[in-house]
């Protein structure tokens, strides 16, 4: 999860795909959209426009958040884990640990299972496979 400064009311899900102009941008953006839609479906509020944003580091080491609607190619680097990879990559922050409502919704065992299911289904959708039904205590959940 993410954290915010004391007194902040920040909450919700956001994720960062590889930025425009990078080799894996399109694939990363597609996967980020799958994650955001899945998290919204289980009740997460989405930060920004649709929960998908880009982040850049400026010359003075300050971060700049940019909505995913801004698709111009920029020279600034993003997170290293999104830059120095040989595959699609997305950094996801599914909640704010400093927000009581986020923690209540996603900090429990049930919330973690819901989130894990979203990630699993997004991975299956990305690869074009059908997810297996979830098995819990002898019951099948879809």
Regions found by a protein language model. Give the residues of each.
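Active-site-proximal helix/loop segments of hydrolytic enzymes
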Residues: 1-142
